Amino acid sequence: MQGKDAAQGFSGRRLRRLLYLVLLAVVVGLSISYWSWVDAQARALVVISSVLDTPVLTAAVEAAGGEPLRSSAPVAGNPALIVRPAGEGPWPAIFLVNGTVPEGRKLPAVRNLAEGFARAGYLVVVPDLPGLTEDRITPRTADATTQVAREVSAKPDTAGGKVALVGVSTGATLALLAAEDPALRGKISLVAGVAPYSNIKTVLNIATTGHYRRPDGELVHYEVTPFLSYVVARSLVATLPSGEDRRTLAAELGAAGRESPHPLSGLRSRQTDDLGPGAKSVVGLLANRDPKRFEALYAALPDETRQDLEELSPLAGTGKISVPVELATGPHDKYFPPSQSYGLVRIAPERRVTVTGALDHAELNVSLEDMQALATFDAFVVRSLRTARVED
């Protein structure tokens, strides 16, 4: 009996030890799993504080981390701001793709965001891509985006040989276009974007007529700010062949200015007898207000113009995006409908869209009355930062 009791006791101890080992394995597994989220949340706090006007929070974040190292150098032939974290690399890299702003990489908000990413432990590159500081986007802009991404991924201080593409507005669209390029396969860890467009034809329709068509053909009214019309017009005129017509129309738009409440009024009232056929068709589209005429006017554009426009539309090509895509937008963005983000599922199976009232296009607005909106945006940032470090 004593031997049996001893055997039972021994078996009981073995069972308890086995249970302890299983429990320990579960705890360790959960710790490893959740630690990456805790780590990403801490980094998200650093990044978000860089774009919020919260002096106490910003001062605490700056005191907790080392001072980033800022430098300027050309990247793939484009002037760029490069911000490195304190300490030794390599680091996970972020290519911050700007929208259309005259100040480009020198805009204080852009520099603050780049420094926030660097304080959070990321190598950040912010180039001035062709056209963006002049309020236009062209195939040359898209090509330069791809070239910069390739060069950043190959930097010796880039961890894992991959770069995360983080874009705002048209910059987010450029990031998506680059991620479609087969030349960058295996060189991108993530695309994270705020308020992109996916189909420039839809954007043209909204900018000129205030409407767009859903996939089922229904016309939807969508009100946007006048600046969209200005950028769309400058980009469309830039597709014309170099010559007098392009110079004339670009000068007329430039005279109206980016702050004009009616940037297309001059084109809508001008005669077109002095213009060639291609320029006439461009003015005809930009001057039109009737959404039912849009399709015919778009079809009348020169073949070269429509080809250039398709090169600026992620949904127009046959490429696929194989990396995770995190997108965030407001419920009614002042430029691009949320449907522009949702539609990307066709080319980006790992696409996730966050809609939050904390975003007013590229601006983060936070109020005590709607902390849930900030929490939703925070979750978007946490997921993005965690994925960007997955190879670290």
PLM ranges: what are they?
Residues 40-89:
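N-terminal cap/lid segment of alpha/beta-hydrolase-fold proteins
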Residues 86-117, 128-129:
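Short, surface-exposed "cap/lid" segments of acyl-processing enzymes
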Residues 105-113, 126-164, 179-182:
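Catalytic nucleophile-loop/oxyanion-hole region of alpha/beta-hydrolase
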Residues 167-175:
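Gly/Ala-rich beta-loop-alpha elbow adjacent to hydrolase catalytic centers
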Residues 177-274:
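Alpha/beta-hydrolase-fold enzymes
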Residues 321, 327-329, 333:
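Short beta-strand/loop motif that positions the catalytic acidic residue
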Residues 334-340:
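Conserved alpha/beta-hydrolase "acid-adjacent" motif
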Residues 367-392:
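Catalytic active-site module of serine/aspartate enzymes centered on a nucleophile-bearing elbow/loop
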